């Protein structure tokens, strides 16, 4: 039976997940992590994607991207393929590095992009790798809240814009929004980004305006 085709269209917004084959690690040291981040940036730039967030863990990674052209499959094939070749060459391995195809969830709702961004930021905490999301170095979260310089291909404004317009800086309000998710995670919430904490609710750290939306054929404000 053939594989179901990916849903691709101009302006689509995705939460993409790629996992190591048989749950094996795909980043064994800092050099691997840094090289994978660089590869993500190269593919984002090459295919004119808009990347709002990413997080790399030992055996998988997450990215959220908008694709002004219907080219997610092409870009992910280059990203995963080039990294797998380098990984196998570096460690003298053969065979698959990643487990089957990547996962791609369409982000359809306005508030879902913020929920996905928070979910991605909290992944290292959820995995027990650190106690707070800003302590994990292989994530875009530190750049989004102003602790690191963002790379030119990272669209942090797409997550910060909904929190702008008040006396408190947008990065501070976005950090508080993620903190809400961290509190829920520690309290045993079933998922910090599954809708338990919808932007605009909880402890008052939600956005003042609606996040940017992505329409077919372009990436425009909605």
Task: Please give the residue ranges for each predicted region.
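Conserved metal-phosphate-binding beta-hairpin within the catalytic cores
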Residues: 63
């Amino acid at each position: 039976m053939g594989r179901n085709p990916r849903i691709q269209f101009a302006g689509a917004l995705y939460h993409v997940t790629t996992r190591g084959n048989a749950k094996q690690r795909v980043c064994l040291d800092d050099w691997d992590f840094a090289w994978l981040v660089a590869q993500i940036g190269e593919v984002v730039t090459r295919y004119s994607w808009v990347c709002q967030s990413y997080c790399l863990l030992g055996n998988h990674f997450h990215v959220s991207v908008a694709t002004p052209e219907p080219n997610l499959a092409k870009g992910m094939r280059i990203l995963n393929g080039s990294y797998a070749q380098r990984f196998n060459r570096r460690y003298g391995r053969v065979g698959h590095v990643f487990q089957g195809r990547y996962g791609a969830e369409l982000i359809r709702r306005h508030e879902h992009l913020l929920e996905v961004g928070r979910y991605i930021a909290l992944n290292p905490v959820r995995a027990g790798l650190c106690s707070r999301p800003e302590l994990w170095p292989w994530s875009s979260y530190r750049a989004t809240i102003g602790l690191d310089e963002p790379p030119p291909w990272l669209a942090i404004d797409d997550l910060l814009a909904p929190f702008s317009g008040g006396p408190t800086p947008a990065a501070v309000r976005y950090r508080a929004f993620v903190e809400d998710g961290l509190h829920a995670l520690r309290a045993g919430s079933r998922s910090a980004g599954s809708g338990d904490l919808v932007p605009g609710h909880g402890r008052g750290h939600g956005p003042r305006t609606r996040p940017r939306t992505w329409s077919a054929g372009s990436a425009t404000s909605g």
